[in-house]
């Protein structure tokens, strides 16, 4: 009799949970329509892979790219709609979140054609690779719209798990295995630290998990200036620091960049920073509203360390991917300036604008590295010497992307940095902006050093890798060059589109 009653209670509870989930999905599902498109694409990939042979490889690329493009289209149609909170307060849609989701989708859309030829040449498993890319993209999108502590923790874990698997995708490569191990260990440690910070925030607010409710809870409990909030701030900053990889949380970055497959590095180098920047902005600006001076100071220290250490160590690197790893550490220091400035003085708009240009500059550079690596099998900077004599198109494309990363006029990087530094100067961050200007000049040195190697025509300096260089016979059909051309164009002609981009970015307040 007791067992019968317990069984009935279990069935009733299960039915209630199912009906509640169905109700949420029915009424709130339209608010995550772009994410639903990606989920549908993932299901299609699995179905096609399990029911077909290798001849359907083009279909796998088509489905992946189409689902990403359709998701972007759905986001654009939803632009400028009223902000909405859905799924019992777990998810929020507004212009700020959607523009970061757009950037993540844009990164993934450009990274898939960047990976096609690489996967074919290295004979890696295709379906799983595309599944991990789409799932990581999905995790990043949910992170951008996360509105409570649980979702803010679960969404990046979804992204991180796929990142660990992607970084070790070439399992026979010792460097790839080493990179994955370091990435996994440091990722697990940072997640533990982040959860510990969340627990302090949860307790101090009286048991609230939604971001805005945490603020109300801190006011009600009078704990907004308590030591518990300071402890929470420190732990959360350290946890988020791993995702953003500023100094001194950057130790994993060079090894993962060097050991992982190059298309994976291209994907992780931009998507992780976009998603983490969106999350960091919301966490610092909403729950820690009353501790703005404290988190401003913490982020200023991280920005200064990142800009100085990243650019100084990049000068000494001999591997192109390690150089870009340290360069990315410096770049995130510039992005942090926008986070500190905030809504006032167009800080978020400058951060978003620079992030868009950084995506094109960085992915364009990695597209050139993927092409050169496939045709020569090397990643050493010295081996790029004389590339202009064999492939002027590739050499010029790489030079333009590097110059844009350095911030030379009239390229996109210059306009992005000028806007970012101007907003920082207007907000009174004089020392931070001066450090940014000096380190930008420093970065130009090591970028120009590489460009000088590319353009050299002296036979004694040209390496055997370039002497034996062979271009792809199917040049017009090379998907890597498609991504490269798109990124190079976006990195070099920003003047026409600069004002519309800034206008859109300014309309992203949350």
Curated annotation (Swiss-Prot):
It is found in: Plastid, Chloroplast thylakoid membrane. It catalyses: a plastoquinone + NADH + (n+1) H(+)(in) = a plastoquinol + NAD(+) + n H(+)(out); a plastoquinone + NADPH + (n+1) H(+)(in) = a plastoquinol + NADP(+) + n H(+)(out). It comes from the Eukaryota. One of its GO terms (molecular function) is NADH dehydrogenase (ubiquinone) activity. The chain crosses the membrane at residues 24-44, 57-77, 99-119, 124-144, 149-169, 183-203, 227-247, 295-315, 323-343, 354-374, 395-415, 418-438, 484-504. Signal peptide: none annotated. It is a multi-pass membrane protein. GO terms for cellular component: chloroplast thylakoid membrane. Keywords: Chloroplast, Membrane, NAD, NADP, Plastid, Plastoquinone, Quinone, Thylakoid, Translocase, Transmembrane, Transmembrane helix, Transport. Its EC number is 7.1.1.-. Pfam families: Ndh2_N, Proton_antipo_M. Its main location: plastid. GO terms for biological process: ATP synthesis coupled electron transport; photosynthesis, light reaction. NDH is composed of at least 16 different subunits, 5 of which are encoded in the nucleus. NDH shuttles electrons from NAD(P)H:plastoquinone, via FMN and iron-sulfur (Fe-S) centers, to quinones in the photosynthetic chain and possibly in a chloroplast respiratory chain. The immediate electron acceptor for the enzyme in this species is believed to be plastoquinone. Couples the redox reaction to proton translocation, and thus conserves the redox energy in a proton gradient. Belongs to the complex I subunit 2 family. This is NAD(P)H-quinone oxidoreductase subunit 2 A, chloroplastic. It comes from Spinacia oleracea.
């Amino acid at each position: 009799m007791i067992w019968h009653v317990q069984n009935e209670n279990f069935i009733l509870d299960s039915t209630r949970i199912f009906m509640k989930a169905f109700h949420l999905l029915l009424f709130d599902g339209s608010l995550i329509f772009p994410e639903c498109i990606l989920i549908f694409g993932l299901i299609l990939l699995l179905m096609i892979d399990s029911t077909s042979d290798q001849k359907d490889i083009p279909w796998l690329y088509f489905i992946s790219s189409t689902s990403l493009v359709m998701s972007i289209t759905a986001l654009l149609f939803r632009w400028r709609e009223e902000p909405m909170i859905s799924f019992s307060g777990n998810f929020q849609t507004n212009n700020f979140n959607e523009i970061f989701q757009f950037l993540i989708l844009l990164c993934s859309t450009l990274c898939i054609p960047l990976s096609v030829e690489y996967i074919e040449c290295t004979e890696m498993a295709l379906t799983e690779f595309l599944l991990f890319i789409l799932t990581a993209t999905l995790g990043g999108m949910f992170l951008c719209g996360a509105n409570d502590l649980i979702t803010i923790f679960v969404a990046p874990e979804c992204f991180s798990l796929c990142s660990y698997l992607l970084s070790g995708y070439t399992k026979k490569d010792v460097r790839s295995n080493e990179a994955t191990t370091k990435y996994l260990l440091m990722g697990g440690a940072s997640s533990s630290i982040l959860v510990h910070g969340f627990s302090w925030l949860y307790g101090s607010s009286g048991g609230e998990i939604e971001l805005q409710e945490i603020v109300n809870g801190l006011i009600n409990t009078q704990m907004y200036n308590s030591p518990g909030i300071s402890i929470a701030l420190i732990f959360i900053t350290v946890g988020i620091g791993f995702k953003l990889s500023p100094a001194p949380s950057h130790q994993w970055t060079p090894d993962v960049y060097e050991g992982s497959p190059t298309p994976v590095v291209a994907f992780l180098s931009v998507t992780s920073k976009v998603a983490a920047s969106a999350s960091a902005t919301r966490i610092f600006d909403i729950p820690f509203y009353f501790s703005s001076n404290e988190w401003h100071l913490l982020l200023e220290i991280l920005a200064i360390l990142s800009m100085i250490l990243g650019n100084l160590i990049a000068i000494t690197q001999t591997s192109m991917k390690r150089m870009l790893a340290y360069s990315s550490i410096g770049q995130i220091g510039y992005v942090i300036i926008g986070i500190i400035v905030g809504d006032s003085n167009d800080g978020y708009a400058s951060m978003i604008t620079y992030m868009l240009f950084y995506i094109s500059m960085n992915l364009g550079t990695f597209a050139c590295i993927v092409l050169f690596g496939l045709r020569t099998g090397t990643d050493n900077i010295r081996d790029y010497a004389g590339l202009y004599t064999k492939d002027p198109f590739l050499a010029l494309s790489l030079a333009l992307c590097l110059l844009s990363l350095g911030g030379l006029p009239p390229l996109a990087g210059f306009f992005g940095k000028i806007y970012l530094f101007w907003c920082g100067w207007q907000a009174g961050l004089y020392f931070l902006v001066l450090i940014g200007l000096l380190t930008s000049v420093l970065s130009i040195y090591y970028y120009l050093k590489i460009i000088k190697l590319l353009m050299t025509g002296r036979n004694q300096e040209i390496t055997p890798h370039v002497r034996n260089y062979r271009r792809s016979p199917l040049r017009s059909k090379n998907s890597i060059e498609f991504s490269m051309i798109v990124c190079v164009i976006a990195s070099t002609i920003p003047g026409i589109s600069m004002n519309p981009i800034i206008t859109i970015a300014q309309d992203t307040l949350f």
